[in-house]
A protein has these predicted regions:
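NAD(P)+-binding Rossmann beta1-loop-alpha1 motif at the extreme N-terminus of oxidoreductases
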Residues: 1-49, 55, 99, 117, ...
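Residues at the starts of beta-strands that form the adenosine-phosphate
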Residues: 3, 26-27, 83, 103, ...
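Small-residue helix-packing motif on alpha-helices
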Residues: 38, 54, 96, 180-187, ...
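Rossmann-fold NAD(P) dinucleotide-binding segment
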Residues: 49-102
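Internal alpha-helical scaffold of NAD(P)-dependent oxidoreductase catalytic cores
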Residues: 98-103, 119-152, 163-202, 246
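NAD(P)-dependent Rossmann-like dehydrogenase/reductase catalytic/cofactor-binding core
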Residues: 189-257
Length: 257
């Protein structure tokens, strides 16, 4: 089994631990100084509040809040043969590398790791087998230039919340029209899941998938006309831009520490 340590058992760290536990191919140590956070991963990994224990794994995941990164790096002792996978939003690889002899890989994950459906973006000097094994166990990933990491942070890091918002909006409108709220949520959720699966499986452009659903004088084409005449696409773009800007701001805040 691959040995992995996760430093920080908050939302993202816990999701990653749960995903690795679900996969079953990893021996995971979870580190946190918060007893409640450790209790949340009890039974899924080896919980510890001893940083030196967490530092023993070949691959160590840094899953703390950006503002905590400098503190952890000041105490974390790793060797040149180890890999430090940082998932802290806005924290550049060069900053982390300046504080450790370990190989540093930067990843922007998301909470779907818990269910093996994570979308992740990774930046490295060369592919790292330990990191690849982790990412493949909990979802899919793409390799990107680190200059695009703020964009990835907005797209796949913050993106799930934007999708939740859309699911809620569609379910709420169906509920307002008389549908049982639970039924509306099931239908809206499965619709997004099915649509995403269709896009993932298709080689065709998304626009052609839309056209395939839009029969002439049918219901879908009427709804699409409303969307195309609205500012929905622009507003979604603005949401991504705002998240990306905040990611860049976090990098500056960490550099100032």
């Amino acid at each position: 089994m691959d040995e992995v340590s996760v430093i920080g058992c908050g939302n993202m760290g816990r999701s990653l631990i749960m995903g690795l536990a679900r996969d079953g191919g990893f021996d995971v140590t979870g580190y946190d100084i918060d007893p409640e956070a450790l209790a949340g991963v009890e039974g899924l990994c080896h919980p510890t509040d001893d940083l030196s224990v967490a530092a023993a794994a070949p691959t160590v995941v840094l899953a703390v809040k950006p503002t905590i990164v400098p503190v952890v790096l000041g105490e974390l002792e790793l060797g040149a043969t180890q890999t430090l996978m940082t998932i802290a939003a806005g924290v550049e690889r060069a900053y982390v590398q300046a504080h450790t002899p370990a190989t540093v890989v930067r990843v922007m994950p998301n909470l779907a790791a818990e269910y093996g459906e994570m979308a992740a973006a990774v930046s490295w000097d060369a592919p790292d087998a330990g990191v690849q094994a982790i990412l493949e166990a909990v979802g899919s990933y793409v390799e990107i230039d680190e200059a695009l990491m703020d964009v990835a942070t907005a797209l796949n890091g913050s993106g799930p919340a934007f999708v939740y918002y859309l699911i809620e909006a569609m379910a709420a409108r169906a509920g307002a029209a008389g549908m049982d709220p639970t039924d509306a949520r099931v239908l809206a959720t499965q619709t997004f899941k099915g649509a995403a699966s269709t896009v993932a499986a298709a080689d065709a452009p998304i626009e052609s998938l839309i056209d395939a659903v839009c029969s002439p004088q049918g219901t879908t084409i009427e709804g699409m006309a409303v969307l195309r005449e609205s500012a929905v696409a622009e507003e979604l773009g603005d949401a991504l831009d705002a998240a990306a800007r905040r990611s860049a701001e976090l990098a500056a805040e960490v550099d100032d520490v």
